[in-house]
């Protein structure tokens, strides 16, 4: 192990270019940016927690949802990819039983007493609740953990659909796993992080986001048994055809205040399932749903019915998308991306909030994407939880400059990201 000052010297000298290139690519400009970013994070750690401490540096990627919008929490399928936008955490063990985390861009220093395991009043929906919940997840798994101090710097857009929460959670989990030699694998860490998000943070999410960040590459997951999801890793290299680029545009609307909207999707789907004798739609045959449609409209309401239809269609589509990727049939995959996007408008109804129709950033971004990409080999859809945040688009290189310029003209400089898929999951880097 090295001190933060020693690591900064080594990074500047290029000693760690190999591990950095494995995560971010070999382009000289990007490597220079990452060297500067890592050095800045190490400096900030020293500022908040003092110089001379031996530290380790961890990285947890964000994720792009490729298919399976709001299917994972119903015990369906999910398809997602880790991306090169990530959270970097500089960490050092301490001996006082406290966790202290300072995150770039946030004024508050999170301080968590590990002696207090239960969820704390007023802490839900805040990062401190995630840290406390992850600690309890490790203890429940029989692991002996202690305190640490950490500084985090995240390029994963907060509240934007790239799952900044999963990147933060996986960063914290990797620190404990590494600093205290817990030896848990990626899937176990993802389960602990989902537990923290559900039970302590108060967001009823599935596990797809955490798995994508933990495992890396492109993953296909079957959540029929959510306690032990079946995960298939599809290597990211070569999935996109030559000349095709994945872009994500931040419409500058945040998910941060939309927990109630997300929860309503799950609640309505599960209300339909309950009428048919199941807890989730994954336990209810689709034929039973269609047979009971008149009664379901009366009991659950039409929006719940439409969201259930979305689940069945999107789940089948996600399975077909997996096969298209494995067989390198990108044109078929792209056609299903468009179908998924249309379903978000018509069935799941999570492109904008019905209570705030004046603000429809996702709708505008999708319409603009259609105006540029229609008739090309590209595709576009909303991604993530919905209602605000980001859209994704597969953009041919011949249209990339036009697309990028148009999106940033509407949504502001720095809003359109040209992404690379990342093969590696959350891990210690230095």
Each PLM stretch: what is its role?
Residues 160-248, 430:
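Fold-level recognition of mixed alpha/beta catalytic cores in primary-metabolism enzymes, strongest
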Residues 1-63, 88, 92-124, 220-381, ...:
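C-terminal nucleotide
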Residues 59-64, 68-75, 155-172, 376-394:
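Glycine/serine-rich anion-binding loops at beta->alpha junctions
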Residues 100-102, 147-154, 183-195, 334-339, ...:
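Beta-strand segments within the central parallel beta-sheet cores of soluble alpha/beta enzyme folds
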Residues 140-148, 176-192, 397-410:
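Phosphate-handling active-site elements
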Residues 53-54, 70-77, 116-124, 154-162, ...:
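A short glycine/serine-rich beta->alpha loop
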Residues 76-96, 215:
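Structural signature of FAD isoalloxazine-binding scaffolds in flavoprotein oxidoreductases
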Residues 135-157:
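Glycine- and acidic-rich phosphate- and metal-coordinating loops
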């Amino acid at each position: 192990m090295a001190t933060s000052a020693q690591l900064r010297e080594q990074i500047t000298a290029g000693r760690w270019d190999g591990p950095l290139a494995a995560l971010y690519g070999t382009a000289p400009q990007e490597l220079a940016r990452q060297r500067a970013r890592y050095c800045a994070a190490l400096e900030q750690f020293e500022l908040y927690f003092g110089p001379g401490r031996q530290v380790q540096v961890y990285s947890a990627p964000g994720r792009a949802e490729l298919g399976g919008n709001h299917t994972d929490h119903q015990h369906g399928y999910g398809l997602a990819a880790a991306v090169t936008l990530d959270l970097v955490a500089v960490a050092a063990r301490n001996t006082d039983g406290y966790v202290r985390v300072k995150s770039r861009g946030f004024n508050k220093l999170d301080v968590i007493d590990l002696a207090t395991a239960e969820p704390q009043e007023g802490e839900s929906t805040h990062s401190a609740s995630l840290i406390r919940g992850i600690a309890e997840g490790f203890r429940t798994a029989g692991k002996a953990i202690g305190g640490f101090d950490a500084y985090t710097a995240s390029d994963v857009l907060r509240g934007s659909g790239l799952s900044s929460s999963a990147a933060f959670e996986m960063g914290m989990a990797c620190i404990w796993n590494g600093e205290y030699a817990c030896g848990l694998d990626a899937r176990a860490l993802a389960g602990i992080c989902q537990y923290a998000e559900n039970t302590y943070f108060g967001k009823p999410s599935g596990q797809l986001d955490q798995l994508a960040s933990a495992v890396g590459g492109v993953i296909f997951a079957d959540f029929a048994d959510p306690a032990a999801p079946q995960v298939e890793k599809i290597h990211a290299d070569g999935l996109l055809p030559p000349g095709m680029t994945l872009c994500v545009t931040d419409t500058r609307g945040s998910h941060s205040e939309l927990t109630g909207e997300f929860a309503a999707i799950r609640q309505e789907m599960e209300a339909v399932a309950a009428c048919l004798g199941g807890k989730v739609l994954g336990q209810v045959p689709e034929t039973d749903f269609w047979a009971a449609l008149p009664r379901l409209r009366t009991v659950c309401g039409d929006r719940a019915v439409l969201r259930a239809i979305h689940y069945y269609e999107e789940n089948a589509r996600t399975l077909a998308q997996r096969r298209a990727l494995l067989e390198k049939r990108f044109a078929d995959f792209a056609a299903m991306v468009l179908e998924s996007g249309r379903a978000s408008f018509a069935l799941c109804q999570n492109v904008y909030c019905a209570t705030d129709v004046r603000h429809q950033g996702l709708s505008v971004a999708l319409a603009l994407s259609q105006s540029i990409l229609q008739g090309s080999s590209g595709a576009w859809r909303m991604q993530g939880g919905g209602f605000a945040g980001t859209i994704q688009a597969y953009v041919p290189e011949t249209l990339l400059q036009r697309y990028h310029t148009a999106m940033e003209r509407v949504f502001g400089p720095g809003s359109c990201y040209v992404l690379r898929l990342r093969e590696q999951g959350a891990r210690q880097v230095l």
